Each structure stands twice: as C-alpha cells, then as structure tokens.
C-alpha cells in the first residue's frame, strides 16, 4: 500500500530558527541523532525509536520535526514512517548533521 507523503518546506525555505527550536528538545534531538547515524537514509517506523513518551507526544514531536523540514512523514493510514531529509539539510545547513553525530547518547557533547 502506497503512503501519502507529508513533507515540510523546500530546502531553500528551511529556517534556522525553526530548526534550532525543533532540535532544542532532547527527544527530537535523539530521533535526529539516530536518523543521521543511519547513512542508508531508509524509512523507519515512528514506533522504532525507544522514546519514553506517549504515542500522542511522539506524534507531536514528529510533526515539529516535519514542519521544521528535518524529516518527511509517510502516512500509511494505520501507521506512519519517517525519513531524514539529509540532502535538504546538508544543502541548506552544511555540517549540521555532523554536529548532531558528535553529541553523545546522554544528550551532551563529548568533552
């Protein structure tokens, strides 16, 4: 069954303030760090992230990431998949994903 793509703004329209607001939350940053580490950029199910929050809160966080232009969501009706917008992010903000990869799993940059 083909899903309906829910996409954020075009690469040239990505706003640094919106991106920083999206990445300010530790749960969203954790999702982005996991996605950035997977160089295959394959689609992942929203439930594949080990987030200690409710489904409703997860839905909110994925929407914030999508609206900031960091991920695409694919709506299959009874589930959603997400995919990192690596090319768009690297085009607009080169090095941002590398910075995310430098963050340790505990949520702070290594010293």
Question: What function would you assign to each model-found segment?
Answer:
Residues 25, 61, 94:
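Conserved acidic functional residues
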Residues 18-22, 26-54, 76-88:
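N-terminal helix-turn-helix DNA-binding core of bacterial DNA-binding proteins
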Residues 45, 57, 102-104:
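Juxtamembrane helix-loop transition sites at the ends of transmembrane segments
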Residues 66-76:
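A short, conserved structural fragment
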Residues 1-17, 33-38, 75, 85-111:
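Amphipathic alpha-helical dimerization/coiled-coil segments
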Residues 47-68:
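Canonical helix-turn-helix DNA-binding module
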């Amino acid at each position: 069954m083909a899903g309906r793509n829910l996409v954020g703004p075009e690469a040239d329209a990505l706003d640094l303030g919106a991106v920083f607001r999206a990445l300010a939350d530790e749960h969203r940053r954790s999702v982005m760090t996991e996605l950035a580490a997977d160089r295959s950029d394959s689609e992942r199910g929203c439930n594949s992230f080990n987030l200690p929050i409710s489904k409703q809160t997860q839905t909110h966080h994925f929407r914030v990431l999508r609206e900031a232009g960091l991920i695409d969501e694919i709506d299959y009706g009874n589930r959603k998949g997400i995919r990192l917008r690596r090319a768009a992010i690297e085009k607009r903000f080169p090095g941002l994903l590398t910075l995310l990869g430098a963050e340790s799993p505990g949520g702070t940059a290594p010293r």
